[in-house]
Amino acid sequence: MKDLSDTLFAEYLEGYKNLIAKVARIYCQDPEERRDLIQDIIVQLWKSFQNYDSTYAISTWTYRIALNVSISFLRKATTRKNTRDVYHQQVEWLHFQDTVIDENLEQLYQFIDLLKPIDKAIIILYLEGCSNKEIAEVMGMSVTNVSTKKQRIVEELKSYFKI
């Protein structure tokens, strides 16, 4: 039975590894800390896997756990470097990369880095194409609250990019 559970979790993880990596990238710019965050997310997913409630979409459940772990990870960041230092380290790290990073995507990440943790979660879900109802379900908020926050974030985004 344990082997079956391990196999199912491995298959599930393979299907959602990009989602997990994306959430971790949004919440953590330092590559080493990001690996730690991804590991924390996977551990929490593993612990919760047996208790998955199939009334929720597996993607919603995954987002909820990944976002909650990421927000908790940020709250513990007081003992780690401040966000600005981490950002500068990330920029230096990017200069050494062999691959070319899409400048527009990187600018979007820079904008998202400036947002509060809850707003980051909302914009991630919005960019993934989630409806206000789905975002509200993942975040445990009202649809109206999500709509208001999302509209404010989009306005900030337009201002940031001078659109």
Predicted feature residues:
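A short, charge-rich alpha-helical start-of-domain segment used by transcription regulators
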Residues: 1-22, 26, 35
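Internal acidic/polar
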Residues: 72, 80-105, 131-132
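Residue-level preference for hydrophobic side chains embedded in well-ordered alpha helices
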Residues: 12, 16, 20, 41, ...
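Helix-turn-helix DNA-binding module
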Residues: 113, 117-118, 128-148
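Short amphipathic alpha-helical boundary/capping segments
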Residues: 11, 107-115
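DNA-recognition helix of helix-turn-helix
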Residues: 67, 138-163
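Structural recognition of an alpha-helix C-terminal capping motif at a helix-to-coil junction
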Residues: 22, 36-43, 47, 56-68
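A short pre-motif secondary-structure segment
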Residues: 122-123
